[in-house]
Amino acid sequence: MKKVLITGAAGCLGKLVIKYLLSEGKYEITALDLKCKKTYKALKKYNRRINIIYGDADDPILIDALVKDHDYIIHLASIKPSFSILREKIVKEIDYKASENIVRAITFYNPKCFLIYPSTTNVYGNKKNAVSTSDKLSITNNNYYTKNKIETEKLIKDKLSNYVIYRIPTVLTDITKEDFIYNTPINDEMEFITANDCAYALVKTIDHKSEVNKKIYNLSGGSVCTAKYGYVLKNILEIYGLSNKYLWSLIFLEKNFYGNTFSDSKKIEDILHYQSESIESYFMVLKRKNKQRIINRFLAEPFIFFINKRLNK
C-alpha cells in the first residue's frame, strides 16, 4: 500500500484530498498540520482512518522522519496570499522554509519520493492575454507570497527528480470555512477552479506519476470556470453578504493577486480528467449553505452596486 503525506491537511483542500484518497481505498494516509482547536476539529473525524501528526512543517527533524517513510507528498502547507503584505523575512520563514525542509529531506533520505507541489498562477503577474507555463514569470512589488512560490519552484526543479508543479488560480472554496481571495482587480478576466476539482486532480496525479513527472501545469477549471473577477465577487457578496475579511482586504490589501486565462490548461485535463464543476454550480452550492445571512446581504448592497458600476464601464 502506497503511503501519502499531506501537509496543511486541515485546510479546505487538505480535507478534500483526504476524502478522495480514502475513497480510493488503496493508500496509507498521514495528515500533518499545526495543533490548534481549528485543526483538531477539522481532522478529528478521521482519527481511526488515517495517521494524524500535529506538528510544524518548519521542523526539520519531524520532516526528515516523515519523508523517509512516504512515497508521495502533497505539500499544501503555505501562508495565505493575503499575508503577502507581511515582511519578506517573516513570509519566507513561514512559507519557504517548510518547502526547503521537504526538498532537503527527499534529496538526502528518499529520492524516489514524489512531490506534488501547488504553486500559484500569480507568478505570471498582470497579463492581458492567455498565458502558458512557458511565459516569463513576474513578481509584483512587495508580493512576497508570489516571490516565495517562484523561489520554491526553482528549488524543486534544481534538486528533485520526482515532482510535478501545479500553478493554481483562485480556488472557489466553502467561504464559511476558508478565506476567499479578495485582492484581485475587478475587471480581470480569469480562470478559477473549484476546491473539489482541485483536490481531485491532486489525488489523481498519483495514478499518472510517470506522465506528469518533472513538469509544470496550469491547473484550472477550464472554460466553465472563466469569468471576470468582479462577476464572481458580486455573486459571492449577493449570496454570502458582507464579511469582516472582505472589509479588511478592501482597506489594507493592494490589488496584487492577478487573474489570468490559460492557453495550455487543457493539457493536464486530458491526462487527469478532473474537471466536473463550474462557477455556476459553485454558486448553487453556496446558496444552499447560506440562506440565513439576511443582514449581511443587506449590508453588502452598496458594495455590489459599486462593483456593478465598475463592471459596466
Q: PLM ranges: what are they?
A:
Residues 279-313:
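Amphipathic terminal alpha-helices
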Residues 124-125, 143-144, 164-183, 188:
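Flexible, glycine-rich beta-alpha linker
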Residues 79, 100-142:
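Conserved Rossmann-fold NAD(P)-dependent oxidoreductase catalytic core, especially the SDR/UDP-sugar
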Residues 165, 183-207, 214-215:
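Substrate-positioning beta->alpha
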Residues 93, 123, 128-165:
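Catalytic helix-loop patch of NAD(P)-dependent Rossmann-fold dehydrogenases
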Residues 48-97:
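NAD(P)H-binding glycine-rich loop region in Rossmannoid oxidoreductase-like domains
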Residues 205-271, 283, 298-299, 311-313:
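Mid/C-terminal beta-alpha module of Rossmann-like enzyme folds, strongest
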Residues 4-24:
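N-terminal Rossmann NAD(P)H-binding glycine-rich loop of SDR-like oxidoreductase domains
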